[in-house]
Protein backbone atom coordinates (compact mmCIF):
# COMPACT_ATOMS: atom_id res chain seq x y z
CA UNK A 1 0.00 0.00 0.00
CA UNK A 2 1.26 3.50 -0.81
CA UNK A 3 2.61 5.59 2.07
CA UNK A 4 0.35 8.54 2.88
CA UNK A 5 2.18 11.65 4.07
CA UNK A 6 -0.50 12.57 6.60
CA UNK A 7 0.06 9.27 8.39
CA UNK A 8 3.83 9.81 8.61
CA UNK A 9 3.44 13.22 10.29
CA UNK A 10 4.27 13.06 14.01
CA UNK A 11 0.99 14.34 15.41
CA UNK A 12 2.57 14.74 18.87
CA UNK A 13 4.95 17.44 17.61
CA UNK A 14 2.54 19.83 15.86
CA UNK A 15 1.07 22.90 17.58
CA UNK A 16 -2.43 23.71 16.38
CA UNK A 17 -4.05 25.83 15.09
CA UNK A 18 -1.78 26.09 12.06
CA UNK A 19 -1.49 25.90 8.28
CA UNK A 20 1.06 23.49 6.80
CA UNK A 21 1.97 22.84 3.19
CA UNK A 22 1.74 19.08 2.72
CA UNK A 23 2.85 18.90 -0.90
CA UNK A 24 2.98 20.64 -4.25
CA UNK A 25 2.47 18.36 -7.23
CA UNK A 26 3.32 19.36 -10.80
CA UNK A 27 1.30 17.75 -13.58
CA UNK A 28 2.55 16.67 -17.00
CA UNK A 29 1.55 20.02 -18.50
CA UNK A 30 3.19 22.04 -15.72
CA UNK A 31 0.07 22.77 -13.68
CA UNK A 32 0.70 22.86 -9.93
CA UNK A 33 -1.72 21.56 -7.31
CA UNK A 34 -1.00 22.29 -3.64
CA UNK A 35 -2.32 20.42 -0.61
CA UNK A 36 -2.46 22.17 2.78
CA UNK A 37 -3.15 20.90 6.28
CA UNK A 38 -5.51 23.36 7.99
CA UNK A 39 -5.23 22.06 11.54
CA UNK A 40 -7.81 23.73 13.75
CA UNK A 41 -7.46 21.78 17.00
CA UNK A 42 -4.62 19.86 18.63
CA UNK A 43 -4.54 16.22 17.48
CA UNK A 44 -5.39 13.61 20.12
CA UNK A 45 -6.40 16.37 22.54
CA UNK A 46 -9.63 17.61 21.02
CA UNK A 47 -11.94 17.07 18.05
CA UNK A 48 -14.67 19.25 16.59
CA UNK A 49 -18.11 17.57 16.85
CA UNK A 50 -19.47 16.50 13.48
CA UNK A 51 -22.35 19.00 13.27
CA UNK A 52 -20.07 21.99 13.85
CA UNK A 53 -17.34 20.61 11.60
CA UNK A 54 -19.90 19.94 8.87
CA UNK A 55 -21.15 23.54 9.01
CA UNK A 56 -17.59 24.91 9.04
CA UNK A 57 -16.90 22.74 5.96
CA UNK A 58 -19.87 24.16 4.06
CA UNK A 59 -18.90 27.71 5.01
CA UNK A 60 -15.19 27.34 4.22
CA UNK A 61 -16.15 26.04 0.77
CA UNK A 62 -17.37 29.53 -0.13
CA UNK A 63 -15.44 31.78 2.24
CA UNK A 64 -12.00 30.45 1.26
CA UNK A 65 -12.86 30.85 -2.42
CA UNK A 66 -13.68 34.50 -1.70
CA UNK A 67 -10.24 35.00 -0.14
CA UNK A 68 -7.86 32.75 -2.07
CA UNK A 69 -7.48 32.11 -5.80
CA UNK A 70 -7.57 28.59 -7.17
CA UNK A 71 -9.40 26.73 -4.41
CA UNK A 72 -10.33 23.27 -5.65
CA UNK A 73 -11.62 21.66 -2.45
CA UNK A 74 -11.63 21.91 1.33
CA UNK A 75 -12.46 18.61 3.01
CA UNK A 76 -12.49 17.64 6.69
CA UNK A 77 -10.09 15.13 8.21
CA UNK A 78 -11.80 12.01 9.52
CA UNK A 79 -10.18 12.70 12.92
CA UNK A 80 -12.17 15.97 13.02
CA UNK A 81 -9.15 18.15 13.85
CA UNK A 82 -9.06 20.16 10.62
CA UNK A 83 -9.20 20.13 6.84
CA UNK A 84 -7.28 19.41 3.66
CA UNK A 85 -7.26 22.44 1.37
CA UNK A 86 -6.43 21.68 -2.27
CA UNK A 87 -5.59 24.58 -4.60
CA UNK A 88 -4.34 25.25 -8.08
CA UNK A 89 -0.96 26.97 -7.97
CA UNK A 90 1.28 27.91 -5.09
CA UNK A 91 0.33 29.94 -2.03
CA UNK A 92 2.48 30.65 0.99
CA UNK A 93 1.28 29.25 4.30
CA UNK A 94 0.98 32.86 5.47
CA UNK A 95 -1.43 33.63 2.60
CA UNK A 96 -3.50 30.56 3.40
CA UNK A 97 -3.46 31.29 7.14
CA UNK A 98 -4.73 34.82 6.49
CA UNK A 99 -7.54 33.47 4.29
CA UNK A 100 -8.43 30.90 6.95
CA UNK A 101 -8.38 33.54 9.70
CA UNK A 102 -10.64 35.85 7.69
CA UNK A 103 -13.03 32.99 6.99
CA UNK A 104 -13.22 31.96 10.65
CA UNK A 105 -13.75 35.61 11.65
CA UNK A 106 -16.69 35.75 9.24
CA UNK A 107 -18.13 32.55 10.70
CA UNK A 108 -17.69 33.79 14.27
CA UNK A 109 -19.02 37.30 13.74
CA UNK A 110 -21.06 37.71 10.56
CA UNK A 111 -22.56 34.49 9.24
CA UNK A 112 -26.23 33.72 9.82
CA UNK A 113 -28.03 30.45 9.10
CA UNK A 114 -29.38 31.85 5.80
CA UNK A 115 -25.74 32.20 4.63
CA UNK A 116 -24.91 28.50 5.02
CA UNK A 117 -25.08 26.79 1.62
CA UNK A 118 -26.16 23.19 1.11
CA UNK A 119 -28.43 22.59 4.09
CA UNK A 120 -31.32 20.70 2.54
CA UNK A 121 -31.82 17.14 1.34
CA UNK A 122 -31.25 18.16 -2.27
CA UNK A 123 -27.82 19.71 -1.75
CA UNK A 124 -26.28 17.77 1.16
CA UNK A 125 -25.91 14.08 1.89
CA UNK A 126 -26.36 14.56 5.65
CA UNK A 127 -28.28 17.84 5.86
CA UNK A 128 -29.64 17.20 9.37
CA UNK A 129 -26.12 17.16 10.87
CA UNK A 130 -25.31 20.89 11.02
CA UNK A 131 -24.82 23.36 13.85
CA UNK A 132 -24.09 27.01 13.18
CA UNK A 133 -23.89 27.58 16.94
CA UNK A 134 -21.12 24.98 17.22
CA UNK A 135 -19.34 26.35 14.12
CA UNK A 136 -19.36 29.84 15.62
CA UNK A 137 -18.15 28.68 19.05
CA UNK A 138 -15.32 26.59 17.58
CA UNK A 139 -14.32 29.44 15.26
CA UNK A 140 -14.07 31.80 18.25
CA UNK A 141 -12.01 29.26 20.20
CA UNK A 142 -9.61 28.68 17.29
CA UNK A 143 -9.22 32.42 16.68
CA UNK A 144 -8.54 33.05 20.38
CA UNK A 145 -5.50 30.76 20.09
CA UNK A 146 -4.24 32.41 16.91
CA UNK A 147 -3.48 30.70 13.62
CA UNK A 148 0.16 29.91 12.95
CA UNK A 149 1.69 29.67 9.50
CA UNK A 150 4.10 27.04 10.84
CA UNK A 151 3.15 23.65 12.28
CA UNK A 152 5.95 22.95 14.77
CA UNK A 153 6.44 26.38 16.33
CA UNK A 154 3.92 29.10 16.96
CA UNK A 155 4.22 31.91 14.42
CA UNK A 156 0.78 33.49 14.69
CA UNK A 157 -0.26 35.65 11.75
Curated annotation (Swiss-Prot):
Task: Write one Gene Ontology MF term.
Answer: S-ribosylhomocysteine lyase activity
Show the catalytic activity: S-(5-deoxy-D-ribos-5-yl)-L-homocysteine = (S)-4,5-dihydroxypentane-2,3-dione + L-homocysteine
Q: Could you confirm whether the keyword Transmembrane helix appears in this record?
A: no
UniProt entry keywords in alphabetical sequence: Autoinducer synthesis, Iron, Lyase, Metal-binding, Quorum sensing
EC number(s) recorded for this UniProt protein: 4.4.1.21
Establish whether keyword Transport is in the entry.
no
Cofactor note (record)? Binds 1 Fe cation per subunit.
Please, which domain of life does this record's source organism belong to?
Bacteria
Give the binding site residues for Fe cation. 54, 58, 124
**A Pfam family hit:** LuxS
Per the record, the GO terms for biological process are: quorum sensing
Q: Which EC class heads this enzyme's classification?
A: lyase
* Reported cofactor(s): Fe cation
HAMAP family with a match to the protein in the record: LuxS (MF_00091)
**Summary of the function given for this chain in its UniProt record:** Involved in the synthesis of autoinducer 2 (AI-2) which is secreted by bacteria and is used to communicate both the cell density and the metabolic potential of the environment. The regulation of gene expression in response to changes in cell density is called quorum sensing. Catalyzes the transformation of S-ribosylhomocysteine (RHC) to homocysteine (HC) and 4,5-dihydroxy-2,3-pentadione (DPD).
Q: How does it assemble?
A: Homodimer.
Tell me which family the UniProt entry assigns to this protein.
Answer: Belongs to the LuxS family.
What name has this protein been given in UniProt? S-ribosylhomocysteine lyase
Which source organism? Lactobacillus helveticus (strain DPC 4571)
Lineage, opening ranks: Bacteria, Bacillati, Bacillota, Bacilli, Lactobacillales
Amino acid sequence: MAKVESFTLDHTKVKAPYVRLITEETGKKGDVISNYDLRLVQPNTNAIPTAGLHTIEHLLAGLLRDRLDGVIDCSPFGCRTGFHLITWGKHSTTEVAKALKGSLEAIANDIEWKDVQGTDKYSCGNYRDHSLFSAKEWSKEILSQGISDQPFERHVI
